[in-house]
Amino acid sequence: MSKIRVGFGFDVHQLKENHPFIVGGVHLEHHSGAFGHSDADVLLHAICDALLGAANLRDIGYHFSNTDERWRGISSLILLEHVVVLLAEKGWSIGNIDAMICLEAPKINPHVPAMKINIAKAAGISEDDISIKATTNEQLGFIGREEGVVAYAVCLIEK
């Protein structure tokens, strides 16, 4: 009998002027970008947390501490690859990933196909098993003021 689990992930990053803005491994042209220890890819961090949570392997901060210089500036696609290895070591494979990005600008939809390609390659799954959606915060709160970006992710894993 197969076993399935569901995981949920969340991440938030502050936006700062003249920082690179990387979401789903895609560099977005924008006046500000996410600030963080790694490349601050909010989408991939939420996905990593969802996967780790589903497998009961703690969270992204446990595995990739922001006090560890090995992870400074690293591509979050590499972090996702590490997470997939951790899951495989426990016998888990990814069924699907469903994610949501919340930000006012820039528009995400034109970049979704490239994001899905990047995530599929790093996770070793089909693009058809990845859903990425985006919404604004209707100009409310820190997201509406373009001070930050949030991502949520849900995943299904199985063995």
Give the residues covered by each predicted segment.
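RNase III-family endoribonuclease catalytic core
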Residues: 2-115, 122-123
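A glycine- and small-aliphatic-rich helix-loop capping segment at beta-alpha/alpha-beta transitions
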Residues: 20, 118, 146-150
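Short acidic capping loops at alpha-helix termini that bridge into adjacent secondary structure
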Residues: 126-129
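Pyridoxal 5′-phosphate
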Residues: 132-136
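Glycine-rich phosphate/pyrophosphate-binding beta-alpha loops
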Residues: 138-140
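C-terminal edge-of-domain segments
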Residues: 143-159
